[in-house]
Amino acid sequence: SRLMSPQPIKGTRALILFVFGFIPVCTGFLIPFSHLLVESYKRIQYAGFSEYLLQASMNTLTLASIATFITILIGFLIVSAARFSRNTWFSRIASLGYAIPGTVLAIGLMLSLGALDHAVADFLEFKLGISTGLLFLGTSFTLIYAYAVRFLAISIGGIESGYNRIHGVIDDAARNLGQNRRGILWRVHFPLLRPAIISAALLIFVDCMKELPATLLLRPLNMETLATQLYAEASRGTYEDGAIAALLIVLVGLIPVILLA
């Protein structure tokens, strides 16, 4: 079979194809993005960058950063273990979280962690006389845990694609040079996997920023993120007041698109 090669197009045909390709970009991105810019500028000119929006931005940045780090670390360890053991069943099971809707995942965590909370609270109260209340539900820990379970598939998939570019001959050469598994992992694999890890981390960070169902159900009381604040404005019908939050999410989401293009 012969590989297909791109064919140059000129004249009217090229113009028509350009217009057809530009229409979805214009209607699906440029026009909405321009509207967000205009409305955000109006809100900043009128009321400035509010304290609530700043706090929501900091909450979003903190939660997404911690969740991204944990998810990448777990994914790296899982895929590396599969590399050495030649067994990928655990990585396949760990990737199932991405197929579960955020609402279903959040409800499942609420039920399981709620039962664990009550069991721990009862034990501490009867054995030590300490009343703790809920230790997991309604905390940032539960939300970060949900993010990690939800987006672990992105970490595993990205790192696996990086591992596919590392030939087994490199591992054999490292062993011949006296490296054990730990040395191969951190001195050989990790430096070669950095581009794949960074790409996966960017995608996970953006997904954590815009994850709404799990955040609404599991967030601590009085904690707002950019996604929940945007949802609150939309539910009140004040769409333009959520323009700044929406613009920030879009701008951060553009980073991996530009870098991965």
Predicted feature residues:
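N-terminal signal-anchor/first transmembrane alpha helix
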Residues: S5-S34, W89-A94, I100
